[in-house]
Amino acid sequence: ENFINFKKIFIIMKLIQTPITDDVINDLKVGDKISLSGKMYCGRDAVLPKLSRSIIDGDTDKYPFDFKGMAIMHTAFSVAGIAPTTSNKTEIESSIPTLSSAGVKFHIGKGSLSEKTKEELNKYNSVFIVCPPVAALLTNNVVSKSCVAYKEEGMEAFFELEVRDIPGIVAIAHGESL
């Protein structure tokens, strides 16, 4: 197979399979290196606020997915592939608490988050994972993709990906951060 084996690069990694459970989160600590496989979702500035609004309004039945145990990477999906965008953009960071309250366990991106967001992640037993912004390598580990919400947003629509061995480092967990 043509997948990049990030486990060889990161040496000691915790292998995580979606959906992510509270037991998995409870076992993670800041600085842990992870390798994520299974379903991962992609969204950023355009769709994350819309998803948050749907959660607040109690209007999530229209989606063909469940937020519980979900991993969301802060990225669009384009012909160039996937790579995390800066997670502390207002539209993205402000959506993290609401998405976590609905069951999202991994928020994957880059950059730092506010103290308030760190507290909200802890409240909902969710974590922030930083991921290397290496589009070619990450995209190589996408097995399949499908647009599952907000198709009108084009490459910034909400995509469901099947991924294998997406690397990351736990940057915020249990009220602690790097």
Regions found by a protein language model. Give the residues of each.
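Active-site/ligand-binding-proximal alpha/beta "capping" segment
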Residues: 95-97, 169-178
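Short, structured beta-strand/loop micro-motifs enriched in basic residues and often containing a Trp
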Residues: 13-20
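Short, charged beta-turn/beta-strand-edge "cap" motif at the junction between a beta-strand
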Residues: 22, 33, 39-43
